[in-house]
């Protein structure tokens, strides 16, 4: 059976992350001792000063993320991603390497991925993957560890330009780089063990078990609106540095608004409202305009390629 983009509406949904994680420190994944964990818990709500740099401004990663080892989250993401790809392949819903839309996605990713390293030192160790799933869903995601997937529906139904694809991909990659999943898992773990930790500061080996049990939640984990807004900004900068017009975020959200018509897709349920996102993107465009102006532009335009228009 051939790859059929319209034949698989009931495949497992991607994470409800946004159109979507990673610490700038290189802390080992081994067990924390009690005092270090206690200290981390007391300072968990505090954020480091804003990172002074050219481009968008975001706060540092929350220390809550440190309660769950990065390797554990990334391994869980890799396992779930591979399971999803196996299921898609068994359903003949995984695009072959020759598919024009997959080639397009991978070409755009080759421009964005090298720019990820300054945002997260762990990203250079990730085994990045990009795949296309035959499903009419309006969805895309990047799991912890750089595992990217787009659903055919979001490309076809929205008739995305290359810059709009780069905007979505940048947003999803930003969730991974900023460790939003790991942070939310850390907050959940802290809530579950908070009373016992604060009272005893002893014997917290079960934290690892809690994190492992929570690994299965990656597919259903939702990000906060603050996470989504941050991913919009970081994703816009990644796209601009990669040579894609950052103003594409405006046209993208206009398309999303027209498509949703009061019934937003599943992964938009926790997002800021479309008009709010458009205003925020427009307000931040001056911060990335010079980055886009200086960036090398893509030599190939896939959104005007005849082979792509036929698929």
Model-derived segments and their meaning:
Residues 2-311:
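A Zn2+-metalloprotease active-site environment signal
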């Amino acid at each position: 059976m051939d790859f059929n983009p319209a034949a698989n509406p009931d495949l497992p949904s991607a994470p409800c992350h946004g159109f979507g994680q990673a610490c700038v420190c290189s802390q080992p994944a081994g067990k924390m001792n009690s005092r270090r964990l206690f200290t981390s818990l007391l300072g968990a709500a505090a954020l480091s000063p804003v990172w002074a740099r050219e481009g968008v401004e975001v706060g540092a990663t929350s220390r809550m993320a440190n309660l769950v080892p990065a390797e554990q989250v990334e391994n869980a993401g890799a396992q779930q991603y591979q399971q999803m790809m196996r299921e898609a392949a068994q359903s003949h819903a995984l695009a072959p390497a020759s598919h024009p839309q997959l080639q397009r996605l991978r070409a755009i990713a080759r421009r964005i991925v090298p720019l990820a390293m300054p945002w997260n030192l762990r990203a250079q160790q990730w085994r990045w993957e990009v795949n296309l799933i035959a499903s009419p869903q309006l969805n895309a995601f990047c799991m912890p560890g750089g595992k990217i997937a787009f659903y055919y529906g979001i490309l076809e139904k929205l008739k995305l330009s290359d810059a709009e694809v780069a905007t979505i991909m940048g947003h999803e990659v930003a969730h991974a780089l900023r460790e939003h999943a790991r942070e939310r898992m850390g907050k959940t773990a802290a809530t579950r063990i908070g009373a016992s930790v604060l009272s005893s500061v002893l014997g917290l080996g079960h934290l690892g078990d809690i994190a492992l049990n929570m690994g299965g939640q990656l597919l259903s984990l939702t990000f906060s609106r603050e996470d989504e807004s941050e991913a919009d900004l970081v994703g816009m900068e990644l796209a601009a540095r990669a040579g894609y017009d950052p103003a594409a975020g405006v046209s993208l959200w206009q398309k999303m608004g027209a498509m949703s018509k009061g019934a937003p897709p599943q992964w938009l349920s926790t997002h800021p409202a479309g008009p709010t996102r458009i205003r925020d993107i427009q307000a931040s465009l001056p911060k990335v305009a010079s980055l886009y102006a200086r960036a090398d532009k893509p030599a190939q335009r896939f959104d005007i390629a005849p082979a792509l228009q036929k698929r």
